[in-house]
Amino acid sequence: GERGYEVTLADRAKEPGGRVSQESTLPGLAAWARVRDWRVGQIQQMANVRVYLDSFMDDKAVMGFGAQHIVYATGASWRRDGVGNTNRDTIKGAGGAHVFAPADVMEGRVKKGPVVVFDDDHHYMGALLAEKLATDGMEVVFVTPSAVVSEFTLLTLEQGRIQTRLLELGVTIRQQTNIAEIGTDNLRLACIFTGQESELAMGSVVLVTSRVPNEQVYHRMAKHPDVMETVGIKTVALIGDCLCPQTIAAAVYDGHLYARELDADQ
């Protein structure tokens, strides 16, 4: 918009912001909403940028819109099969109706306890979901193959406070432990060193393991360069998490870089 282009933003959601709008509802992350709010304020001052919320566009609508440049910012989705840093194959039993992903917690769909949060991502998400569930009154067990909760946050000097917070809330922590199998009302756990197994009763399981980019729409479009040329589309690009699951800061940088480099060769 600042470079003078006519820009149309079609957002499938009813509010702008993508994952920022979701994650800023988690305990302690309200300030993250400013990442969205500042940009919304800037866009509202630009006559050449139009925003359409609750506006899903299929391939046909994109093709017929008349834009010369198409940018997909469709994000990434948390896996529901348990594949992550430790498990390279689907965890047995991961397809059950009592097995959830992070979005289900943020949208209030996890109702039955005890809840096991399995964190094989090791960043901030698993611990925050456990904190939210605990403050909502659920009995929570935090299971992780790591030696500590949210191992990545050792680099940001937050790890001690995060683990202390969970313990203060009564969250049970099972470290250096993997999930071998998900049953209907219990888990079969395994020590990551010896493989020794144990059982853990549960009502729901939340898998926080890894994310996959929502890139399918881009690839469908990119397969038809002849059609794109016919309708006047010059370029199609991916930015943010749908290019590669990353931090919010990196996704913002990705979008800014695209905007700076558009038509740079002309």
Language-model region placement:
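Short acidic, glycine/serine/threonine-rich loops at helix termini
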Residues: 20-22, 65, 81-86, 154, ...
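FAD-site-proximal beta/loop scaffold in flavoenzymes
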Residues: 86-123, 186, 200-265
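Hydrophobic pocket-lining residues within nucleotide cofactor-binding pockets
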Residues: 16, 56-57, 105, 242
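A Rossmann-like FAD-binding core segment of flavoenzymes
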Residues: 33-80, 94-97, 102-104, 110-112, ...
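Short, electropositive, low-hydrophobicity segments enriched in small/polar residues
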Residues: 21-22, 79, 244, 259
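Gly/Ser/Thr-rich beta-alpha loop segments that engage phosphate groups in nucleotides
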Residues: 19-20, 77, 212, 242
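Beta1-alpha1 glycine-rich phosphate/pyrophosphate-binding loop at the start
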Residues: 1-50, 117-161, 169-172, 216, ...
